[in-house]
Amino acid sequence: MAETDSFLHLARPLGPVAVGSAPTTAPLNVVIQPQAIFSILDHSLRRNADQERVIGTLLGTRSEDGTEVEIRSTFAVGHTETTDQVEVDMEYQKQMLALHLKANPKEVLVGWYATSSELNTFSALIQNFYSGQGDGTWPHPAVHLTVSTEPGKDIETRAYISAPVGVTAERAADSAAFIPVPYEIRYGEAEKSGLEAIASAKDAESRATNIFTDIEALERAIEEVLGMIDRVSRYVESVIDEEAPASTALGQFLLNALALAPKVEPADIERDFNNHIQDVLVVSYLANTIRTQMELSNRLATAQLTLGGEGASAEAGAQRGQRGGKGGRGGQQRTQERASEEVRA
């Protein structure tokens, strides 16, 4: 990912525009979530071969004062672009926007993206649509995010807002001055671990990687921290020995990093760590004990049901045998009575 640039943002009117119809151009900071970048890259990979760029809608949140926009999700919008005209499926965009806002009521429309760094007249037309009243972001500015997706090159990202410009009101409808604004790609620890796992597969022939367990991930993180500490130690030693030039900014950064470390004695850290390990072992032992008791209870219940079923079957068979024996004795008595009657006759 390309490094971010520094901007000096001056808000000023750039052209004639009706009062109350122009979005504000106050200083703005844009925060981009990694999943939004991945969604844009996936859309770029699925584009038609004859398309130079694809566009889509940006969704996210906006701070209460409107000075910070966080881009969280995106969706693609179909469009056809030639040298003379551009056609955008605005009806599809409106329906998809309503669906996304219904599923995620905390998100709002914040702008649009394009997979090309070029800014032209068509970009101004689309920008004016997204920043307009009604279905646009008005009175807030619409963010235009450009993501360069040229094969073999680094992914370059730029963020812009626009101000109206034009000699007449008619020309202002298809014109806009794009103003670059600072942006930041922000991710948490879980997202960072996922990105590192994905990046580890880029050098493999199979383009696949294994997901580490918690213990393996902890071991890997500790090894990385130890490696960084060794690298910093070597740099400090080289500066002390006047083998490398000193950097005031780097020294201040290291000083601030050391100030964040808790001032605890190593013996206290070791004692707390051992206590934590013992607590974890106790919890694990109790969990295994409960699991074993549950398995024994299930097996005992199953055994009782099995034994109870077999005993009931044997008892029912004995009762049927007794009833059969009684029936046989009754038949013998009736046969003897008939024989006695025949003899008397």
From Swiss-Prot:
Residues 335-345 have a biased composition (Basic and acidic residues). It comes from the Eukaryota. Residues 312-321 have a biased composition (Low complexity). It is found in: Cytoplasm. Keywords: Cytoplasm, Initiation factor, Protein biosynthesis. The keyword Cytoplasm applies. Residues 310-345 are annotated as: Disordered. Component of the eukaryotic translation initiation factor 3 (eIF-3) complex. This is Eukaryotic translation initiation factor 3 subunit F. It comes from Aspergillus fumigatus (strain ATCC MYA-4609 / CBS 101355 / FGSC A1100 / Af293).
